[in-house]
């Protein structure tokens, strides 16, 4: 008689995804980040659920309720710290996961890749509305600045902003709906993750060579299930260490001050994981242009499969394209630094050069280099 896990309608799905899944024998640690993102999502939903039990989404009590969680709720300080820093680890994993996809040509699985980009947008939206909830100074002014960007939409801009706000400024209605969105989105993300995996399992994973690995597959369990568990342990140790030893390292001190519409903080800036996009937004002196650049800085990922000109999939055997990849990584690091700096010389011009280079690498240099490398492979 066949094993129950292979015949039971529900267990069969889990078995095909987690036990008997054929995986390439040579996938490296860079393939761990998908499962780590799943762990991050589960941890965020769990800690978020416990926070939501004690949080109140009203401007009169939101800030106090967060203070109450940290002071009076059993291990509330830990739950909040894990949730806030968990978001940072979520983005570390997501950026490494995308970097892996770009380096090894995973984007050629177009459905999986495009759903991944939609997932990135959903996670970014969730993080944004979540940052508003503690109702500190940076929460309030961050919400004001970013929602105001919608006013750049021609003709309907102002109506759109007031519709999002639920009034004529960021107020109680805004906070309440942002809490509703922040509660809802993670479950939408979980559903989209399932679709992401369904499309991935249609084709199977890529591998570091970029070659077809059908001839050399191993089962997911026990090999990669244990490899994933090691990743889980490392991530959780790192997260707990940060949450216990320096929980406010990545936060903004301005958010310890309750929101005040009459006092603008000297430097309005988002959390570190949005700084690269914020730098691109600020580097264009026109409002609509900046908003479009901000949007396109993420959506450009959807163009990557179209701009793939090389005969090889991965960058493993393509030194020139490898150089461009690391140039892009360095460029994003520079943008992240610039996003946290005040708008003054020389940061303005550095930001503008880095923003130009960001799009130039994706749209011009990568496809051209792919064609060049194809030419170099021709035997004469």
Swiss-Prot record:
Cofactor binding notes: Binds 2 heme b groups non-covalently.
SUPFAM superfamilies documented for this protein: a domain/subunit of cytochrome bc1 complex (Ubiquinol-cytochrome c reductase), Transmembrane di-heme cytochromes
InterPro entries given in the database record: Cyt_b/b6_C, Cyt_b/b6_C_sf, Cyt_b/b6_N, Cytb/b6-like_sf, Cytochrome_b, Cytochrome_b_C_euk/bac, Cytochrome_b_N_euk/bac, Di-haem_cyt_TM
Subunit structure: The cytochrome bc1 complex contains 3 respiratory subunits (MT-CYB, CYC1 and UQCRFS1), 2 core proteins (UQCRC1 and UQCRC2) and probably 6 low-molecular weight proteins.
CDD domains listed in its UniProt record: cytochrome_b_C, Cytochrome_b_N
Function: Component of the ubiquinol-cytochrome c reductase complex (complex III or cytochrome b-c1 complex) that is part of the mitochondrial respiratory chain. The b-c1 complex mediates electron transfer from ubiquinol to cytochrome c. Contributes to the generation of a proton gradient across the mitochondrial membrane that is then used for ATP synthesis.
The species this protein was found in: Astronotus ocellatus
BP GO terms, sorted: mitochondrial electron transport, ubiquinol to cytochrome c
Record bears the keyword Signal: no
Family membership: Belongs to the cytochrome b family.
A GO cellular component annotation in the UniProt record: mitochondrial inner membrane
Annotated keywords: Electron transport, Heme, Iron, Membrane, Metal-binding, Mitochondrion, Mitochondrion inner membrane, Respiratory chain, Transmembrane, Transmembrane helix, Transport, Ubiquinone
UniProt miscellaneous comment: Heme 1 (or BL or b562) is low-potential and absorbs at about 562 nm, and heme 2 (or BH or b566) is high-potential and absorbs at about 566 nm.
Compartments (UniProt record): Mitochondrion inner membrane
Protein name per Swiss-Prot or TrEMBL: Cytochrome b
Membrane topology of this protein: Multi-pass membrane protein
């Amino acid at each position: 008689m066949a094993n129950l896990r292979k015949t039971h309608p529900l267990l069969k799905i889990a078995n095909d995804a987690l036990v008997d899944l054929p995986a390439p024998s040579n996938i490296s640690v860079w393939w761990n980040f998908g499962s780590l993102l799943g762990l991050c999502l589960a941890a965020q939903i769990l800690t978020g659920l416990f926070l939501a039990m004690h949080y109140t989404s009203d401007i009169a009590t939101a800030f106090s309720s967060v203070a109450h969680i940290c002071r009076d709720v059993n291990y509330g300080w830990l739950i909040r710290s894990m949730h806030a820093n968990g978001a940072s680890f979520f983005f570390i994993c997501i950026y490494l996961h995308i970097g892996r996809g770009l380096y090894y040509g995973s984007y050629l699985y177009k459905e999986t890749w495009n759903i991944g980009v939609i997932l990135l947008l959903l996670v970014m939206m969730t993080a944004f509305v979540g940052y508003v909830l503690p109702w500190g100074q940076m929460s309030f002014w961050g919400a004001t600045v970013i929602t105001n960007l919608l006013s750049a939409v021609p003709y309907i801009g102002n109506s759109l902003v007031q519709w999002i706000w639920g009034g004529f400024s960021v107020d109680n209605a805004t906070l309440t709906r942002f809490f509703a969105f922040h509660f809802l989105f993670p479950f939408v993300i979980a559903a989209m993750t399932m679709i992401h995996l369904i499309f991935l399992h249609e084709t199977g994973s890529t591998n570091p060579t970029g070659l077809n690995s059908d001839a050399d597959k191993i089962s997911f369990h026990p090999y990669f299930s244990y490899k994933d568990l090691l990743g889980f342990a490392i991530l959780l140790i790192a997260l707990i260490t940060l949450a216990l030893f320096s929980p406010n390292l990545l936060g903004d001190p301005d958010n310890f001050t309750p929101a005040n519409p009459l006092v603008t903080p000297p430097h309005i800036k988002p959390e570190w994981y949005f700084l690269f996009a914020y730098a691109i937004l600020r580097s264009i002196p026109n409002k609509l242009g900046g908003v479009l650049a901000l949007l396109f800085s993420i959506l450009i990922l959807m163009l990557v499969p179209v701009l793939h000109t090389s005969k090889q999939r991965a960058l493993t055997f393509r030194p020139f394209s490898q150089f461009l990849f690391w140039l892009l990584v360095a460029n994003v690091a520079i943008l992240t630094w610039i996003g946290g700096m005040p708008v003054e010389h020389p940061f303005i011009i550095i930001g503008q050069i880095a923003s130009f280079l960001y799009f130039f690498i994706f749209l011009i240099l990568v496809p051209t280099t792919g064609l060049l490398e194809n030419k170099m492979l021709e035997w004469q």
